[in-house]
Amino acid sequence: MIRLFFTSLFVLFTSAGVYSQQADTQQFNSKFSGIVYCDGNENGRQDRGEKGMADMAVSDGFSVVMTDRSGRFSIDANPRARFISVYTPDGYRNTNRFFSDIRNDIAANNSNTGLDFGLAECETYGSFAHMSDIEDRIYMDWIDRMKEYAAIHNQDFIAVTGDICYETGLRFFSQAMTDANMGRRMVYTIGNHDLIKGHKDCWGNDYGEKIFEDCFGPAWYSFTSSGVHFIVTPMLTGDAKPSYSPDDIKAWIQEDLRTIPQGMPVMMFNHDAAESLVPENANVKAFIYGHRHDDLRSVTDSGVTYFCCMSPSKASNDHAASALREITFNRQGEITTRMHYAPISNHIVAHEVNGIVRAVVYDAASEPVKAEVILQGGRKVAMRQLNDMIWEARLPQAMAPESVYKVSAEFTDGERIIARQQQERGLKWMRTLPCKTYFCNPIASGKYLYVAGMDNENARDCAVFALNVQSGKIEWSCAVKNSIKGDLALMDGVIYAGDVDYNVYAINAEDGKIIWSKSVNKTFYPSFTEGIHAENGRVFAGCAGSLCALDARTGETLWTNSHKHGSITNVCTNRTANGALLTNGYWVGRFCYDAATGEFLWEKKDNDNRYSTSTPAVLDSTFIYTGYGAIMQVAARSGQELRKGSYPYIFNTRSEPLVCGGRIFVGTSNNGFLAVNFSDMSQAWNFLCEPAVIYTSPYTKNREKTVESSPVAYKDCVIFGANDGYVYCLKQDNGLFQWRLKVGLPVLCKPLIVDKLLYFTDFAGNVYCYGLE
């Protein structure tokens, strides 16, 4: 969780005296020695015949020494040392702890000559799981699912990059997810909320890392696995001041790098994207972090790939889905990743159109290894896997369209699941894109339906697509540099898009050729997730420090935001009314500017506006949007609040309110779909959908009934998607259920209705066309 209010990571460390010791250490002379040995019987102690291991790296966190030919080492400890650690070599595991706690010895200026570390050979797999910001303090179902995942997947370790969260969380996870009960090494890094106030070391220095060290051992160390060297580093600032400085960590990294072969691939861990810690003299391939509550893959100018991930337990601030990241690598440091989305479990939903069956086949913990269609009479048709979520088969031509069939799937955990075909309601066509789709609302113009995709895993298949509105055929695709999560804009025959790396594109809507592209200013938050808005020859992109207006024809910057409000993220799409541009900065507030000049007009920073993520609706010269627990109408130019209703729900969704028939319709994070009376803002009705199969609304994690989708009106009904994997149709006046379409995965976009045809996308990258009559 980011609560640093966007201060530079290093401001707290600029004073030369911050880390000066409070006691005289000139007489300090603690020495530590011992042996690193091959523990043949793996009992955690050195027995007769078990020999020492030469050239093993041992460190006190400041300097590094190597064992001699007999496996013995001796180190003169730094006065601020806390642990003596052996850096686990490739192909080995520790049979006792990889560190020895020397804090009491340091305080007493004692020496210790009996530090023994056992190592045993083990298999390595070139793979690990990554999660971050787990922030729980009680045992929940997702921990059991993580143990299932660990039992099924052969991996070298599991990395948790910080914000285990506060003393209660640290102590809980030091027991709940250990090497022993997870069946592999657990690598924890310290986050800003893991630095706990109220502690001093034996020299009187602030000691924010004390509780973390009590629970997990050293906050920085390294190890090697599957040909790659891994460096674990600590968060540099946080809720309490640590005893270490950035210079301490940088100096230790240089010491550490002396112990590995030149050119060996290196990956680094930290709670944040601490680019200042990346050494220039090393072959750093990846930096793994959390903190920003995002699912992001991005490559810097230096060539280092940064991977951010949240947790499988909950959704994150930028509405990134609840997931862990599986990272696979080889000895050259080449990396591929895959997201495992939760809490979806043993899940099959099948559709058939024009003789082709496509099925969602997915389980968060295990992998589908086989899927097949079971026809009437028991005949089976093998399915092929299109992506990590979708399987496909072509049915025999002789089958009647109304035939009933089942889909069977087998998973690596031994489970076999069978599901009956969904009875289709007017499915005209269905197209599976080579990437996933997120909040991007489909746009139709002429013969084309435009959508955009994301690839948070490897950024290989990110593109804008033009599909034939009648058949779903992909007429063209335009590759972009990274994921597009927000809305496209269409104006004067040009599609405008923005990817998560802050690149804005103008694309010819007829042939998919890029007319211009431009990189806009990055902000403190690393990911551009908001939608693009275009009108009157201008393209509006970004939020906070990246907010700008571009000339739609040339991409030239017309103005940039000079009112540098902060922001964690923004997933809504900016809107204009009466010449005013309304934008959003999650955790900070709503901000409004003159659309022509960029002049700052007004801001709202109360709690309802701070925790607001909905795209605003425009009604005449006003904006209507949701706050954390409220729906508001404000005058566009002045910001005057004209109406406000507060409700016992959380509106932490992207859902854009629909104003229709004297009502406001909108989705909630936790309680389904809501209709309120526009005249007095009183609740008209509330419809409860099913619990989310994948969480996307920030901090949802406990079977919340989430609707991120924006509603559309159709006759006297309202249609919207939901995170439970359904598209719903309800009566506007009373919320009476009319019908629902079972898609199987979250529908996050705003459905589109054109000529009595309903278009929408799902999380897996399926595009659907249904006839409404």
Kindly label every feature range from the protein language model.
Residues 27-32, 40, 88-90, 95-172:
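N-terminal active-site segment of His-dependent metallophosphoesterases
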